[in-house]
A protein has these predicted regions:
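Active-site rim/adjacent substrate-binding subdomains
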Residues: 1-96, 108-118
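Catalytic glutamate of the conserved HExxH
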Residues: 100, 104-108
Length: 118
């Protein structure tokens, strides 16, 4: 079992491993850990047969208007409970956390699910 603190550290580690060319583009975004997705998060899930591992809440970079000055930060939530349920050991959990962080950042950059390998 991975504690919440260790899980948060693994999310931070995944962010720290981003190539600088992508990390430098992250602006006005918060990456947080939540235990479970909310009902409204689940409503956004197209395939109810799978666990929701993370979600991007915001406006993708490709759809932003550049004249907006004061925007609330976008948010990526990584869901601890679902990730721990779909993985069998610590190594799998670490890989899934990394893959989920990368996937949700893909949405931030404007990619849809079909356009991502993760």
């Amino acid at each position: 079992m991975i504690s919440r603190k260790e899980f948060e550290n693994l999310v931070e580690q995944a962010l720290g491993e981003l190539p600088p060319r992508f990390a430098d583009l992250l602006q006005n975004i918060a990456v947080i850990v939540e235990d479970e997705p909310s009902d409204s998060d689940l409503d956004a899930l197209a395939d109810r047969g799978h666990e929701l591992l993370g979600i991007y809440r915001g406006t993708p970079m490709t759809k932003r208007r550049h004249n907006i000055v004061a925007m609330l930060p976008d948010q990526i939530a990584i869901f601890r409970g679902p990730i721990l349920r779909v993985t069998r050991n610590r190594g799998e959990a670490v890989r899934q956390i990394r893959d989920t962080v990368i996937h949700e950042l893909g949405h931030y950059f404007g990619l849809d699910d079909e356009g991502m390998a993760y």
